Amino acid sequence: MTNTIPNWIKLNNEIMIQKDGKYQFEKDKEAVHSYFVDYINQNTVFFHDLKEKLDYLIKNDYYEEEFLSKYTFEQIKSIYKIAYSYKFRFPSFMSAFKFYNDYALKTNDKTKILERYEDRVSIVALYCADGDYEKAVEEVHTMMKQEYQPATPTFLNAGRKRRGEMVSCFLLEVGDSLNDISRAIDISMQLSKLGGGVALNLNKLRAKGEAIKDVENATKGVVGVMKLLDNAFRYADQMGQRQGSGAVYLSVFHPDITDFLDTKKISADEDVRVKTLSIGVVVPDKFIELAREDKDYYMFYPHSVYKEYGQYLDELDINEMYDELVENPRVRKAKGNARKLLEQLAILRSESGYPYIMFADNVNKVHPNEHISKVKFSNLCVTGETLLLTENGYEKAADLYKKQNDLKVVIDNRTKDFAVGSKGTTIVDAIPMQLTKKDAEIFKVKTKQGYEIRATEWHKFYVKRDGEIQKLQLNQLKTGDKLLVQSAEGAYGKIHEPDLAYIMGIIAGDGTITEKTAKIYLYDNKKVLEQKVTDAVHRIIQKHKVDRAYKHNTSLLPTFNMANPEKQDLLYMNSTVLFDILKKFGMNKETKTRVPEFIFQANKETQAAYLSGLFQTDGCVNANHKAKALTIELTSIHYESLQDVQKLLLNMGVYTTIYSNNKRSQELLPDGKGGSKLYNVKPTHKISIQDRNSRELFMSIVEMKEYDVYKFNLLTETLQPKSRKPKHDFTAEIISIEEDGVEDVYDTTQEDYHSLIFNGIVTGNCSEVLQSSQVSVYTDYDKEDEIGLDISCNLGSMNIVNVMSNQSIASTVRIAIDSLTTVTRKTNIVNAPAVARANTLMRSIGLGQMNLHGFLAQNNIAYESEEAKDFANTYFMMVNFYSLQRSMEIARETGETYYKFDGSTYKSGEYFEKYVTNDYSPQYEKVKKLFGDQHIPNIQDWMKLKEDVMKYGLYHSYRQAIAPTGSISYVQSSTAGVMPIMERIEERTYGNSKTYYPMPGLSAQNWFFYKEAYDMDMFKVVDLIATIQQHVDQGISFTLFLKDTMTTRDLNRIDLYAHHRGIKTLYYARTKDTTQEGCLSCVV
């Protein structure tokens, strides 16, 4: 018996039979017509009307009745009428075949067809609108115009009575116990049965040879678990309609990594080889660094790490912890060579296409929800002596850590909206100070004006560049950058000691402290202060006298004496009692010139009194009437002391600059005996108050000597009523960034705006320490399980060609988000409790895209061109904008935001920085024309959206993910995802016949724009995907296309370039056999 080849297959094959030297693309449409007339129509069950059809499908358990009962029959009929009004025709045989073979509902024996394309679209629209007729109308229009296509699980299952889940993919954490492993396998099978793809994180599993209950060399490692999963996924599928799909991930720092990779070797032994299970490798930046330096590297046994640190290997920041793990003798480790492993990865990917690669730090660096990702030990941190401005004034980070109190901190208003003009401060809540890393590498940032800070390279700063505010990590700063410093009066403490503060200021300026005595000197025009100082000292002694025995001649009411009665040029006071009181409050011989710690937590009157005493003795008003220049200055040989004063003044709203004279010199100074003589002096430094606003504010707060007040007023009266705006604009210019040792570091989290003021400098803060995916702990039957957070996501994709043709980006995104949201709400996977919990709390969706190469080719734009990047930059920005907008609107409508939204960079506004500072409109005129009359969101639109999101929140934790779009691309007659095509005319084998699929709209005119991926420069492909990635909050399915002439070194170069450009993940690496190549271009 011979199998007859159907007529539609013959017609499709005639595409490749040249006529006049050209392919016969028109034959594909003839094949579609034959397929319908000769097969589809002949095998479709006939119903007299829609009611008869629906009654039959419900009665025989093909359709759910519940979702249909939410509409009237007239509404349902109207949706079907809309669908059929389009008179839809599949443009290619492959698209029609894919739909009817993979998606159309069939009788139980699979012999008869129960749905046409219009029927499936109508049911999906009704199901995803969930009783909202107007939404159902929008969705049926959008799907019939093929602007939006739900992913396979939704398109296949929506509305069916016997169905799988509509969620596309899951990620499970696997705990390190037999109960955890068994439960993970069971849940994987349940999810596979429902039609979902499942990825599992194996990094918590003990490596081969680790101990169990202190018995060494007892564990089998990850490969045994992989074999179990491989068999599980092959066994559990969706009733034969959709095969099970699983993937497992392991870090390059796990000791089983080599065995893990060997499971995909073509030559691997059957005992270790996995057949259907996909594998992926997690690559942190530290590994890339070690490979570039051609160094050996260490892998760490997870259980020994857990025993030592109480956290799993994949929960640690390996970039920061690597050296500590290497040096820690209690952490078991194995040695390897980073470059050799990179080479092994390249060889295996060339042979099998595996493993997938995830660049862990590229994912985390731009993760808007990093506050609920794994713990970051090296996030945004400062050293212990750094002063944080709180509602109680300045307090040391280390001291706050010891107290562990909830904080109220002062922030600069410019960090709220990134507006240069929004000067001012606000007091907001923050969590208790945290010790975020021990022995962290420290860098010192110095500014031209004297402000300094010591922090880790990840600490974030607010920088004014090109008139705009940006938030940058320390390792992104450069000399010349202008850091924001506090722009208005802040907050003060509650300590009230103005007399004590005043005398401390006097002594810091013109006093000395010996081993037992405090001395105060008054000379020249300072002698007028005699009575004021004497009265203050007496009040201090009366209030704070130390309970101790003094000599009989010790005065409790010390007075000034004349050092040289004849000259009457020096007054001095000695007091042992005052010495004891000053010592009690932290002032002694060594600390005399530093601002006492309690002053930083004192009230404004007390701080002003200290500054008054200091400036009355060591300060002056420098007035130049000719130049109309007026400055208030304070000179000292102690630079750090002036920095203390600078912080106090900045908190009062007074901007200062510190100047240094680094040359040693001689000065005429009092000799302590009533006379003067030349002394060698150390280099001097001067704090200067120059701008008019700061000068006048200072004089209203701090009491200067009468003569200085006279000079100040005399010149001020000659100035214009209004002065120009200060040039400093409350910024400080960086002059150096230097390594500065290793120390413990601290930080807190201010969840509203993620900003703080350290040492007067406006900075970012740490994100909250939680995990986005939390491992579950499954116990024995008599104990309660601990359910964590696994990850689920339902997908759908927009067809770029049709969306752009219909000028409908905004409306399609809105409709797609609504549809995906309904799927999320209607999903409850009880067999996977951690997935169900995450779906309820996180509400993640994944709006993707397809037909990018098709769109570019049909508009005569080369995939590798600058114009392609220009289009992608604008298009994907718009999708991001409208998806954020719709998620915000749903949050506003429902009053609900996703779990822990308040800790996200969406809430802080940080996420929007690049959008409110950069214009993403098209740069090329040709690309501009493609967008037609569609509104392209501008900076003002983004600023409004930022404001709305910060106010109302977001409903979804994740919104975009660009999947490969395999089968649904064929249904849409689309190129897959955002990747370039592999072949201009695909050849497929079904049964005993071949079929051909020309790329959508392929013609002689666009033939060369449909360049095949294997002929492209992969570096330029990386550039285009990197352009897209910056607008996509999740990942992109990115396949590398290689020729077999490429070396492993070539592949490594591409991988490293992808990492450098911020690519998050690399999917398959496909290799083409160049010996089979033929030339097709001559027969177009």
From Swiss-Prot:
The lineage of its organism: Bacteria, Bacillati, Bacillota, Bacilli, Bacillales. Disulfide bonds join C169-C793. The keyword Nucleotide-binding applies. InterPro entries: Hint_dom_C, Hint_dom_N, Hint_dom_sf, Homing_endonucl, INTEIN, Intein_C, Intein_endonuc_central, Intein_N. One of its GO terms (biological process) is intein-mediated protein splicing. It comes from Bacillus subtilis (strain 168). Tetramer of two alpha and two beta subunits. Residues 503-654 form the DOD-type homing endonuclease domain. Keywords: Allosteric enzyme, ATP-binding, Autocatalytic cleavage, Deoxyribonucleotide synthesis, Disulfide bond, Nucleotide-binding, Oxidoreductase, Protein splicing. CDD domains: Hint. This is Ribonucleoside-diphosphate reductase NrdEB subunit alpha.
